[in-house]
């Protein structure tokens, strides 16, 4: 079972490897704004739990288990960003909002949010209807 912190690391490592082809402790530390020694400790734990293989000074490689969960975590993050955009959350608030909620939702909830995103993406009229409702409620709340 992964903790929210483990998930943040796995997600970041997965994204770095997808983007650069590799992930170094220094890259992970910079991306997560943490000290390299914290990264080393977590990477050793993730190695022990078989999410990745870590060789000091040689970098790290995600195992198939690590890749699978990494892909799912990136999907969850991107889906939540897409959902918040659809419902009209201010762009500058989206990242922090996703970071605040992503670890607290069950995968069942994520799947249902995915259904909602798909529903809105399939027909632009649905997005327009939502915006119309939001305008009415904004008007009533003023």
Curated annotation (Swiss-Prot):
Where Cd(2+) 2 is bound, by residue?
A: 11, 77, 99, 102
Protein keywords: Activator, Cadmium, Cytoplasm, DNA-binding, Manganese, Metal-binding, Repressor, Transcription, Transcription regulation
The record's listing under PROSITE patterns reads:
HTH_DTXR
Q: How is its activity regulated?
A: DNA binding is strongly activated by Mn(2+) and Cd(2+), but it is poorly activated by non-cognate metal cations, including Co(2+), Fe(2+), Ni(2+), Ca(2+) and Zn(2+). In the strict absence of divalent transition metal ions, MntR has a low affinity for DNA.
Residues noted as binding Mn(2+) 1 in the record, renumbered to the chain: 8, 99, 102-103
Q: Which GO terms describe its molecular function?
A: DNA binding; DNA-binding transcription factor activity; manganese ion binding; protein dimerization activity
Task: Please summarize what the entry says happens upon disruption of the gene.
Answer: Null mutant is very sensitive to manganese. Mutant also displays increased sensitivity to cadmium.
GO CC terms, sorted: cytoplasm
Annotated Mn(2+) 2 binding lies at: 11, 77, 99, 102
> Where in this chain does the record put each HTH dtxR-type domain?
1-63
Give a GO biological-process term: intracellular manganese ion homeostasis
What the record says about its domains? Contains an N-terminal DNA-binding domain and a C-terminal dimerization domain. Contains two metal binding sites per subunit, site A (corresponding to metal ion 2) and site C (corresponding to metal ion 1), which both contribute to the metal selectivity of MntR. A large metal cation is needed at the A site to correctly orient and position the C site ligands. Smaller, non-cognate metal cations bind at the A site, but disrupt the C site, blocking the full activation of MntR. Binding at the C site also favors Mn(2+) and Cd(2+) over other metals.
Subunit info here reads: Homodimer.
State the NCBIfam families in the record: PRK03902.1
Functional description taken from the UniProt entry:
Central regulator of manganese homeostasis that regulates the expression of both manganese uptake and efflux systems. In the presence of high levels of manganese, it mediates repression of the manganese uptake systems MntH and MntABCD and activation of the efflux systems MneP and MneS. Binds with high affinity to the regulatory regions of its target genes. The manganese concentration required for activation of efflux is higher than that for repression of uptake.
Query: What family does the entry list?
Result: Belongs to the DtxR/MntR family.
Record protein name field? HTH-type transcriptional regulator MntR
Provide the species name.
Bacillus subtilis (strain 168)
Supply the gene name. mntR
């Amino acid at each position: 079972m992964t903790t929210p912190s483990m998930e943040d690391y796995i997600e970041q490592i997965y994204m770095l490897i997808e983007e650069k082809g590799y992930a170094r402790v220094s890259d992970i530390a910079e991306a997560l704004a943490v000290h390299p020694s914290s990264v080393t400790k977590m990477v050793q734990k993730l190695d022990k739990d078989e999410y990745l293989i870590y060789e000091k000074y040689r970098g790290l490689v995600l195992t198939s288990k690590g890749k699978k969960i990494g892909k799912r975590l990136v999907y969850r993050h991107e889906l939540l960003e897409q959902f918040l955009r659809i419902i009209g959350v201010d762009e500058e608030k989206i990242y922090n909002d996703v970071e605040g909620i992503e670890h607290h939702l069950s995968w069942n909830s994520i799947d249902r949010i995915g259904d909602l995103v798909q529903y809105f993406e399939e027909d632009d009229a649905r997005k327009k209807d939502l915006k119309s409702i939001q305008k009415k409620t904004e008007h009533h709340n003023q």
